[in-house]
Amino acid sequence: TLAEKCESGEIIYDLRIKENHAADEHKSHLLLVPSGELQRTVADDAQHTLPNFRQGDAIVLYERNADTDNVTNKMVFKGNIDYLNENEICIRLRATQQNSSVLPSDSLYAIEHDAMDTTFRSMYQGLYAFMSATKERRDLLLSQREPQFDVALDKQIAEAADDFTRIALKAKAAKDYFLLVGPPGTGKTSCALKKMVETFYKEEGAQILLLSYTNRAVDEICKALSSIRPEVDFIRVGSELSCDENYRDHLIENELATCMRRTEVRERINRCRILVGTVASISGKPELFRLKHFDVAIVDEATQILEPQLLGILCAKGENGKEGVGKFILIGDHKQLPAVVLQNTEQSEVYDEALSAVGLKNLKDSLFERLYRTARQHTDAHRTYDMLCRQGRMHPEVALFANQAFYEGRLLPVGLPHQLEDSGNINRLSFYPSQPEPMGSSAKTNHSEAKIAARLAATVYKEHSEAFDASRTLGIITPYRSQIALIKKEIEVLGISELNQILIDTVERFQ
């Protein structure tokens, strides 16, 4: 209902077109502004909720001049949010609109989130790719054969100067796959992945594919690549609006903009030895594997990716039916960021004995978790995986609970200044009980928790007074985007303008 959409910030309406560039050949867009009338929720005029939208979001736009107008009975225009602020929203349209009459200037408009079916389609394609893969690759993924390793590197691995060098050498020694468990703050992307890339890049002609689940994580990979010296050439596959401005020059559309012939496109892609993108964006471009063979694919955030989402890439075929990816490295932490699915454990449990025998016990598990679980059962499989144990993010008192509950006490502090601070009277880990939502309410929002978060934010602001820095003093992490809107609403009610600038986001975005 409209009331529910307003409550969770899933709709913005009563918008007018300020500038219409829908007919532009390149980057057609619309600039929308509030109509000047206060946006109301059906449930309660006083319960204004801030919209739950951000740059890059896929949206649908439609005329909405009455409460009965919605996406099912009006013409829909698809696009993405270019930028938005409290005064205006810029929508980048997916298709140009030469007929100006379809977007009348005197009409009111609404935007809602778009539901994409490409993810489901790519998973079916991934399953087909798996069934069409070579027997050797299928046997590997189903644990029917042991992964192979270059034992000649054992001495170097044993004598490695530090954790990241050891892990990079183990990744190099792997002929099939390698798993890296990276608990929070251990540098799995900024240090471990970077070291792996440096190691593989030294091999003449080695082609590297870097993947992650979210665009924000791909930004972090690009940041790590940009810090490598001497500089390395890389191309990012993805859309402009989902890419940090610092790395847009590396986007494939910009890298190929000067190419006049198909041969030039092929040459540019073949010349670049590192390609980066989300699993979804690479899955959507299977032709890449016909253009070049990747010696290694490194997947960050691998524990967030379900098996069908990743199989299409790991089982992709290149020219002459050869495997598109030589070997793969999975980096993640199933204790910290498991895959997010709607079904509960009972609904996704696997009962087939043959599947259980190869480790497929629950469809909620990622490929990383299944392979890691299988490797742990073999005492001689130490070459298959490793774990980073030195973390530089949390104070030991903050890390204590997670360390004991999930990591068997193996996490050690690096010893950075903030980890050595005396806590004094500070309680670094507190639990606040909240009230559950009424039966039938969304599981992704909780009003009680939003009020608690706002109250604590006000306390932090008052304690820091003039020293409060919205960009550094306080951040609020919440599991779901729908809850972000509720927390922002409660903070807005406080009337403290500085708190409106703090970062409130999901676990994945902070990670």
Region spans (language model):
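Conserved helicase NTPase catalytic core signature
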Residues: 210, 218, 222-295, 309
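Walker A/P-loop
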Residues: 174-198
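Pre-ATPase regulatory/linker segments immediately N-terminal to the P-loop/RecA-like helicase/translocase core
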Residues: 24-173, 223-226, 231, 237-255, ...
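Walker A/P-loop NTP-binding motif
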Residues: 189-204, 220, 224-226, 315-317
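Conserved helicase motor core of SF1/SF2 NTP-dependent helicases
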Residues: 202-206, 214, 266, 280-282, ...
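Eukaryotic intrinsically disordered and solvent-exposed regulatory patches
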Residues: 45-48, 67, 76-79, 165-166, ...
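Beta-strand cores of modular interaction/reader domains in eukaryotic scaffold and signaling proteins
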Residues: 52-54, 58-62, 80-82, 90-92, ...
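Pre-Walker A (Motif I) flank of P-loop NTPase domains
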Residues: 174-180, 205-207, 273
